[in-house]
């Protein structure tokens, strides 16, 4: 069984036991959270929401809170010798999917 969930402005296809890297969600490592923005549940019978499925939820356990890889942004102006490099590390949460209810 799989589900398509929406969190942090993005959509993820998840199955039970998957490790998923998502935008930061508040909570401590080991906490269990419920993701109730489920767009679709598939398996033997496919259910598609309009846009969300009422009563469907995905439960997950927080495995890690941290930062993603650094993204470098380089600015320059031609012929002027102006060069700047900026870096950004997005805060992320790693989840392990423990259950899907439809």
UniProtKB/Swiss-Prot annotation:
Pfam families (alphabetical): Ribosomal_L21p
Task: Report which superkingdom the organism of origin falls in.
Answer: Bacteria
Can you name one GO molecular function term for this protein? structural constituent of ribosome
Q: Which terms are listed as keywords in the entry?
A: Ribonucleoprotein, Ribosomal protein, RNA-binding, rRNA-binding
* Residues making up the signal peptide according to the UniProt record: none
- List the coiled-coil residues: none
Is Ribosomal protein among this UniProt entry's keywords? Answer: yes
- Offer one example of a GO biological process linked to this entry: translation
Q: Which PANTHER family match?
A: 50S RIBOSOMAL PROTEIN L21, LARGE RIBOSOMAL SUBUNIT PROTEIN BL21M
Protein name, please? Large ribosomal subunit protein bL21
Task: Provide the species name.
Answer: Syntrophotalea carbinolica (strain DSM 2380 / NBRC 103641 / GraBd1)
């Amino acid at each position: 069984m799989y589900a398509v969930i929406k969190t942090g402005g993005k959509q993820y296809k998840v199955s039970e036991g998957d490790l998923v890297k998502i935008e930061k969600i508040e909570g401590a490592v080991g906490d269990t959270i419920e993701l109730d923005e489920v767009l679709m549940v598939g398996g033997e019978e496919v259910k598609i929401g309009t846009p969300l499925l009422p009563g469907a939820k995905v439960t997950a356990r927080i495995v890690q809170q941290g930062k993603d890889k650094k993204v470098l942004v380089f600015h320059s102006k031609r012929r002027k010798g102006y060069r700047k490099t900026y870096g950004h590390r997005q805060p992320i949460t790693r989840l392990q999917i423990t259950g899907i209810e439809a």
